[in-house]
C-alpha cells in the first residue's frame, strides 16, 4: 500500500495537472478574445463582435474551473505539505498573497465589467477591459512563478530559528529563474490558446458551419499560435 507521503504526492500532482490544463488555456484564449474585439473596434465588422462573445464564453468557463482548482491547490499547500509551508511560508506566501490581492482582483474586476457592459459602454472603453484581463492573467502567472522560481533557485532569505525568512524582496522577484519561466509559460499559453481556437474553428469549417465566422477565428488563432511558437522557441533556447 502507498504511504501517506506518496498519497499526498499523488493527490497534489492530480490537482496541479488538472489546474494547469486550464491556466495556460485561459491566458492564451484571453489574448485571442482581446484581439478579436480589437478587430471589431477597428473594422466595425459585426462578425468580430460575435467571435469575441463566442470565444469569450469559452474563456469564462475555463477561467472559472481554473479558479476553483487553484483554490483547492492552495489549500493542499497547507494540508498536504504543512511542514514545508511552516518552513518557507514567510517567503512562499508573499507572492501568493500579492497574486491574490493584486493580479487576481484586477483580472476578476475587469472580467466582470467586460461581461456585463457589452451594450452599456463605448466599444473603445469596453475593449480596454479585456486587455486589462489579459494583463491581469499575465500578472497572476508572474507572481505564481516568483514562488516557483524560489523553489528552483532560493534567493533573498536567511535561515532563522529553523525557518526560512525573507530578507530581500527585490532579490526574490528579480530571481533570474523567474524571467525564464515567465517568458516560457506565457508564450506557451499563447501557443495553446491560439492552437485551440484554430483547431476548433478548423473542425467547424470541415462541417461547413458559419464559414466566415470560423475562417476569421482560425486565421487569428493561427497568427497567435505563430507568435507564441516563436516565443517558446526563443524562451526555451
Give, region by region, the residue ranges found by the protein language model.
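Polytopic transmembrane helical bundles with strong interfacial aromatic enrichment
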Residues: 1-237
Amino acid at each position: 500500500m502507498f504511504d501517506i507521503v506518496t498519497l499526498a504526492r499523488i493527490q497534489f500532482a492530480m490537482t496541479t495537472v488538472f489546474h494547469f490544463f486550464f491556466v495556460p488555456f485561459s491566458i492564451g484564449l484571453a489574448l485571442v478574445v482581446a484581439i478579436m474585439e480589437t478587430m471589431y473596434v477597428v473594422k466595425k465588422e459585426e462578425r468580430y463582435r460575435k467571435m469575441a462573445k463566442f470565444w469569450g464564453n469559452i474563456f469564462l468557463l475555463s477561467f472559472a474551473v481554473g479558479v476553483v482548482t487553484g483554490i483547492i491547490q492552495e489549500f493542499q499547500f497547507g494540508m498536504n505539505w504543512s511542514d514545508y509551508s511552516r518552513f518557507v511560508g514567510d517567503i512562499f506566501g508573499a507572492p501568493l498573497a500579492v497574486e491574490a490581492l493584486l493580479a487576481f482582483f484586477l483580472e476578476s474586476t475587469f472580467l466582470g465589467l467586460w461581461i456585463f457592459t457589452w451594450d452599456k459602454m463605448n466599444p473603445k472603453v469596453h475593449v480596454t477591459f479585456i486587455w486589462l484581463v489579459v494583463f491581469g492573467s499575465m500578472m497572476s502567472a508572474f507572481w505564481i512563478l516568483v514562488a516557483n522560481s524560489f523553489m528552483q533557485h532560493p534567493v533573498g532569505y536567511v535561515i532563522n530559528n529553523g525557518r526560512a525568512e525573507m530578507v530581500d524582496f527585490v532579490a526574490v522577484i528579480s530571481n533570474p529563474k523567474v524571467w525564464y519561466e515567465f517568458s516560457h509559460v506565457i508564450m506557451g499559453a499563447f501557443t495553446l490558446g491560439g492552437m485551440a481556437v484554430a483547431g476548433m474553428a478548423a473542425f467547424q469549417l470541415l462541417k461547413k458551419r458559419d464559414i466566415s465566422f470560423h475562417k476569421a477565428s482560425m486565421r487569428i488563432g493561427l497568427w497567435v499560435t505563430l507568435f507564441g511558437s516563436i516565443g517558446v522557441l526563443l524562451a526555451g533556447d
